[in-house]
């Protein structure tokens, strides 16, 4: 077998091993929600900013919103811990 081909095979195997190890660490890492906070005029609460959406998504308990074109800020904030 060619030395260069053998070296490429070793490097590929090492990359697969390190990638698999990194995935195992990611499974045990705590999940953090990455939603951005937004504020609408006249509201004191924080809302959830949805980027490039025309309306608030269903299933999150949103009851009101305001537009900050091209994004939308949805209320009430349905996730705790912020």
UniProtKB/Swiss-Prot annotation:
Its main location: secreted. Coiled coil: none annotated. GO terms for cellular component: extracellular region; nematocyst. InterPro entries: BDS_K_chnl_tox (IPR012414), Myo_ane_neurotoxin_sf (IPR023355). Keywords: Cleavage on pair of basic residues, Disulfide bond, Hypotensive agent, Ion channel impairing toxin, Nematocyst, Neurotoxin, Potassium channel impairing toxin, Secreted, Signal, Toxin, Voltage-gated potassium channel impairing toxin. Residues 1-19 form the signal peptide. Weakly expressed in the ectodermal tissue from the distal and proximal tentacles, body wall, and oral disk. GO terms for molecular function: ion channel inhibitor activity; potassium channel regulator activity; toxin activity. Disulfide bonds join 38-73, 40-66, 56-74. The keyword Signal applies. GO terms for biological process: regulation of blood pressure. It is found in: Secreted; Nematocyst. Residues 20-31 form a propeptide. It comes from the Eukaryota. Blocks Kv3 voltage-gated potassium channels. Reduces blood pressure. Belongs to the sea anemone type 3 (BDS) potassium channel toxin family. This is Kappa-actitoxin-Avd4j.
């Amino acid at each position: 077998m060619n030395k260069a081909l053998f070296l490429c095979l070793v490097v590929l195997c090492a990359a697969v091993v390190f990638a698999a190890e990194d995935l195992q660490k990611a499974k045990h890492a705590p999940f953090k929600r990455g939603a951005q906070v937004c504020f609408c005029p006249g509201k004191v609460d924080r809302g959830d900013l949805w980027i490039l959406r025309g309306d608030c998504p269903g299933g999150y308990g949103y009851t009101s919103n305001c537009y900050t074109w091209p994004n939308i800020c949805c209320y009430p904030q349905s996730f705790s811990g912020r």
